[in-house]
């Protein structure tokens, strides 16, 4: 069956139960050198621009979700306005530290309001402090591994990115 996959240029990605890819069988996507070349040739300025676009999409989505609340308290209305003000600053961020700060501030507003009805207080990754944090952690893990599998499938270098850098 693997030979048939190769004949028809089908790549088989095997995932663990948490969606972490552990084996890719078939046509090696690492040969997609044009994609990787474009990925590596991005300047710092271009990568910062891409990171800003990603954060703008994320934060606009969070703002949209907050705006959809039916009965908005005065506090929520004020925080929606504050979120709008921060979003306007994102295109002008001069570096990753500023961008991370804007993202953090909006996320704090979003999570504090969006999950208020379930008595959620803060994000605690890997702490398993309560059911919402446990479920968020599981969901983030699945999402991260699934996206990683898709990126590997297309040939991206998962260790060279535009935003969360180490």
Each model region followed by its residue ranges:
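Active-site helix-to-loop segments that bind/position phosphate- or nucleotide-bearing substrates
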Residues: 31-166
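Trp/Phe/Arg-rich N-terminal binding region typifying the photolyase-homology
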Residues: 1-38
């Amino acid at each position: 069956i693997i030979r048939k996959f190769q004949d028809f240029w089908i790549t088989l990605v095997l995932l663990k139960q948490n969606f972490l890819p552990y084996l890719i069988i078939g046509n090696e996507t690492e040969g997609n050198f044009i994609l990787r070349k474009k990925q590596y040739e991005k300047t710092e300025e271009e990568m910062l621009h891409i990171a800003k676009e990603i954060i703008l999409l994320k934060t606009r989505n969070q703002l949209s979700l907050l705006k959809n609340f039916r009965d908005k308290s005065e506090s929520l209305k004020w925080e929606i306005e504050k979120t709008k003000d921060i979003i306007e600053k994102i295109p002008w961020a001069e570096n990753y530290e500023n961008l991370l700060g804007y993202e953090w501030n909006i996320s704090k507003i979003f999570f504090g309001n969006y999950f208020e009805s379930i008595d959620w207080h803060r994000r605690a990754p890997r702490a398993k402090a309560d059911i919402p944090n446990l479920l968020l952690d599981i969901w983030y893990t699945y999402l991260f591994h699934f996206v990683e599998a898709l990126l590997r499938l297309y040939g991206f270098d998962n260790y060279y990115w535009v935003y969360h850098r180490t």
